[in-house]
Amino acid sequence: MTSTVPRELVHRAAVAEVFLTGWSRTAENRFALTAQWPRAHSYFTPVNGCYDPLLASETIRQVGTLLSHAEFGVSFGDQFLMWDLHHSVRPEQAGVGAAPADLELDVICSDIRRRGRRLAGMRYEVTLYCGGQVIATGGAAFDCTSPAVYQRLRGDRVGATGVRPLPQPLAPASVGRFLTTDVVLSATERPLEWQLRVDEQHPVLFDHPVDHVPGMVLMESARQAAQAIDPSRPFLPTTMRSEFSRYAELDRPCWIQAEPLPAADNGDRQVRVTGHQDDTTVFSCLIGTRGAAE
């Protein structure tokens, strides 16, 4: 019988947001995991018949938290600080079929750091297979810390809430979304710059209360910014490499800027997206799409 892993292991409140279904250790720092992607999802909606590539990033994120708790002894209540997260999806293998996609994941952990017996952080790389074919690759690096250290680090930021009222969203179609509630960008008077919309009531992007803007929200802002450059040309984010340099606070404006890079000879396009808050960079993302996605 197949079921999802306990939601607590992947830091999700809603069972519907859990994509991992099992795991086992295959070597000292190597693991085999299984996952399932639904044919339809309330937020990670298919793009031109292809699974949303950000579903790969969310699956990769869940891998790190699960292994930390289940295999590396990280206590519930410890906090995770994500430094980078990346994916590369093969759209020719990622088409939505007649049944949910059952995935097998090969995970290799490295740069494992400990403070005494406590895990302090690590890096891991993931290869995702579907039907024996590689559907995506990716990885991430993070630190983890005790609640006491996190409290000292965040201070009075713990418990902060977002900017109200929410700024007006862009038109959903201009950023590749169907619903206004799923739009995370708001227009500004400056070209290729938007204000981040932080809707803490969103049931997927804010699955549970947090005291900062989640990394997946920042990655979604990069995807939407890349699409907003030219809404008439679909932008399937087959590659994303995000780096998080500091917390993006909920209660201060965050500005998202996009810089289109020259297209490759084969039509592949890349956009560099950065997020700034109080004149400081909080994240950067290099996001790409294949020429065939146009």
Curated annotation (Swiss-Prot):
E.C. number(s) listed in UniProt: 2.3.1.277
InterPro entries cross-referenced by the UniProt entry: AfsA-like (IPR047757), AfsA_hotdog_dom (IPR005509)
Keyword DNA-binding among UniProt keywords: no
Organism domain of life: Bacteria
Gene: barX
Presence of keyword Transferase: yes
Phylogenetic classification of the source organism: Bacteria, Bacillati, Actinomycetota, Actinomycetes, Kitasatosporales
Name of protein: 2-oxo-3-(phosphooxy)propyl 3-oxoalkanoate synthase
Keywords per UniProt: Transferase
GO MF terms, alphabetically ordered: transferase activity
Annotated TM spans: none
Assigned protein family: Belongs to the AfsA family.
Main function: Involved in the biosynthesis of virginiae butanolide (VB), a gamma-butyrolactone autoregulator that triggers the production of the streptogramin antibiotic virginiamycin.
Phenotypic consequence of gene deletion: Null mutant is unable to produce virginiamycin. Addition of VB restores the deficiency of virginiamycin production.
Natural source organism: Streptomyces virginiae (Streptomyces cinnamonensis)
Stretches of the chain forming a coiled coil according to its record: none
Top EC category: transferase
Enzymatic reactions: a medium-chain 3-oxoacyl-[ACP] + dihydroxyacetone phosphate = a (4-alkanoyl-5-oxo-2,5-dihydrofuran-3-yl)methyl phosphate + holo-[ACP] + H2O
